[in-house]
Amino acid sequence: MNIGIVNDLPLAVEAMRRAIARRPEHRVLWVATDGPQAVELCAAQPPDIVLMDLIMPKFDGIEATRRIMRPERPCAILIVTSCIGANAWRVFEAMGAGALDAVDTPRLGDGAAGDTTKLLLAKIDQIGRLLDAPGSSRLAGAAARGGAGPLIAIGASAGGPGALASILGNLPADFNAPIVIVQHVDRAFAEGMAQWLDGQTRLAVRVAREGDRPQPGVALLAATDDHLRITRAGTLEYTREPAATPYRPSVDVFFNSLTEHWPGRVIGVLLTGMGRDGAIGLKALRMKGYHTIAQDEATSAVYGMPKAAATLGAARAILPLGRIAGELAALARI
């Protein structure tokens, strides 16, 4: 795997070089020390993955991510920066621009068994599996009605935080439908992302806990590296199965559980993201008679998951991001 490093600190660059050198199948393709240089190198010598710092000269990692994700063939981006916790809002902004995940910068002198080195290599491996997954871009009758509004099921990956903030922020305060969100995000960031999204909307947003029931006007965010499912009893549960999937939590797993167990209406929404997770599940929802929506290409940070849904005929409506909240509000009133 060819890897680009974007970081202006020599010690951090050396620590990443040493970590990458422990895997013979990986090599450092180039090193950029600022945002503009990173954008130029991604265009001239596209790597398989970019290790992107957040705080740099000229323009930061958020803007660099945004510009790198604009071309026809964007690069996979992993945020690698110091003090992830202190920079949580920047991490979410970068993920909203298309970054896939985030991890702390490895420490120089950290051996092969060191925690920071292991975490970095594990994240690189995880993204590698995602890139190699089939369909990944390198980049019937209606269901019975429930008493409240329909359950809104949303799946997202790269670019998802920003898209979710836009949709949730444009829903009315009296929106009377439960929302469950499956966003590809490490469990370490789920709580912070829920808090960040909660500040973008008049609705309540929090992480989904084992045994929760979807509630009108509340958005629940999948919060672990396990899959989220709805049970026959109408509660949420986390499960390790299926184990053989590059996506954790998986949008498909959640969508498919709704077709099996949810007694009321469902509106399925598939947003920006790399790969094809959620496309088959969205198709199952549509075949069950539920309304399904996919984000359009023009407004997607990464047109992978919604493209797969469109190809399968899984989406009843393909909409720009700015129209999705209004569509949900209108459908919830029906």
From Swiss-Prot:
Its EC number is 3.1.1.61, 3.5.1.44. InterPro entries: CheB-like (IPR008248), CheB_C (IPR035909), CheY-like_superfamily (IPR011006), Sig_transdc_resp-reg_Me-estase (IPR000673), Sig_transdc_resp-reg_receiver (IPR001789). CDD domains: CheB_Rec, REC_CheB-like. It catalyses: [protein]-L-glutamate 5-O-methyl ester + H2O = L-glutamyl-[protein] + methanol + H(+); L-glutaminyl-[protein] + H2O = L-glutamyl-[protein] + NH4(+). It is found in: Cytoplasm. One of its GO terms (molecular function) is phosphorelay response regulator activity. It is an enzyme of class 3 (hydrolase). The modification 4-aspartylphosphate is found at residue 53. Residues 2-120 form the Response regulatory domain. Keywords: Chemotaxis, Cytoplasm, Hydrolase, Phosphoprotein. Residues 134-334 form the CheB-type methylesterase domain. GO terms for cellular component: cytoplasm. Phosphorylated by CheA. Phosphorylation of the N-terminal regulatory domain activates the methylesterase activity. The keyword Zinc does not apply. The active site is at 157, 184, 277. Pfam families: CheB_methylest (PF01339), Response_reg (PF00072). Disulfide bonds: none annotated. The keyword Zinc does not apply. GO terms for biological process: chemotaxis. It comes from the Bacteria. Involved in chemotaxis. Part of a chemotaxis signal transduction system that modulates chemotaxis in response to various stimuli. Catalyzes the demethylation of specific methylglutamate residues introduced into the chemoreceptors (methyl-accepting chemotaxis proteins or MCP) by CheR. Also mediates the irreversible deamidation of specific glutamine residues to glutamic acid. Contains a C-terminal catalytic domain, and an N-terminal region which modulates catalytic activity. Belongs to the CheB family. This is Protein-glutamate methylesterase/protein-glutamine glutaminase 2. The gene is cheB2.
